[in-house]
């Protein structure tokens, strides 16, 4: 096993390493978003090198990090991180709204995202939400809950990662693919009782199949079951 305790540089950010590795062969250490948040792990590179990562606890691997460099054979071990795409919700337009409207919208947005069990980080007047379902479903949730006036877009996770602190990156990307996914695509306003939070749900196990939930809820004056 080759022990990696330090990051030599980054081929995507450091001009010196970009020049040094211009004609080099890359032996990639491919990590998913959960593995990338760990300062200690053991994994094989694409060319079969047994790598033991043992970094300081505050250090998080980034896409393009150079972990080893064999100058004689011109082979570099480089990190490749496969991050999920991210939905970016722009809250800037709320600054022109009244304080009451701003508070109401932010509360309702937080409730809607939480109701989906979606992780989120708020920074620079934006909300970052890692994709756990198809973009069409996330788009539907935003529009069905009445947030179409808030600009939102879908970007690569690698674009967002540099904007985050280590703790924010762990919150946003660490293990997002392991969470159960609930997609609620109907507005509470559509319910005849107004306050009912029962919405058709799709439950994904991450293994390629999903199923609907049958469950009951209360409208305050009576309880009943719903079956889909």
Curated annotation (Swiss-Prot):
GO cellular component, one term: cytoplasm
Entry keyword set: Chaperone, Cytoplasm, Nickel, Nickel insertion
InterPro entries in the record: UreE, UreE_N, UreE_N_sf
GO biological process terms, semicolon-separated: protein folding
SUPFAM superfamilies per record: Urease metallochaperone UreE, N-terminal domain (SSF69287)
Positions with biased composition (Basic and acidic residues): 204-228
Sample GO molecular function, one term: unfolded protein binding
Location in the cell: Cytoplasm
Stretch list, region Disordered: 188-228
Membrane-spanning ranges: none
Gene3D superfamilies hit by this protein: Urease metallochaperone UreE, N-terminal domain (2.60.260.20)
Domain of life according to the entry: Bacteria
Role noted for this protein: Involved in urease metallocenter assembly. Binds nickel. Probably functions as a nickel donor during metallocenter assembly.
NCBIfam families: PRK13262.1 (NF009761)
Family indicated by similarity: Belongs to the UreE family.
Full protein name: Urease accessory protein UreE
Natural source organism: Yersinia kristensenii
């Amino acid at each position: 096993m080759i022990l990696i305790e330090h990051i030599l540089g980054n081929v995507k950010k450091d001009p010196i390493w970009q020049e040094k590795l211009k004609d080099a062969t890359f032996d990639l250490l491919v990590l998913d978003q959960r593995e990338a948040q760990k300062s200690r792990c053991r994994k094989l590179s694409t060319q079969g090198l047994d790598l033991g990562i043992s970094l300081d606890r505050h250090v998080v691997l980034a896409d393009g990090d150079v972990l080893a460099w064999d100058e004689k054979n011109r082979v570099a071990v480089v990190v490749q991180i496969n991050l999920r795409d991210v939905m970016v919700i722009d809250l800037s337009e709320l600054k022109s709204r009244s304080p009451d409207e701003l508070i109401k919208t932010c509360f309702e947005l937080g409730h809607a995202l939480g109701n989906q069990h979606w992780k989120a980080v708020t920074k620079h007047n934006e909300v970052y939400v890692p994709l756990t379902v198809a973009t069409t479903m996330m788009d539907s949730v935003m529009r069905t809950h009445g947030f179409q006036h808030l600009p939102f877009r879908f970007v690569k996770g690698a674009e967002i990662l540099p904007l985050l602190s280590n703790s924010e990156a762990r919150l946003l990307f660490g293990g997002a693919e392991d969470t159960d996914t609930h997609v609620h695509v109907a507005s509470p306003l559509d319910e005849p009782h107004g306050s009912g939070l029962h919405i058709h749900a799709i439950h994904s196990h991450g293994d390629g199949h999903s199923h609907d939930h049958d469950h009951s809820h209360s409208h305050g004056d009576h309880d009943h079951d719903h079956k889909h």
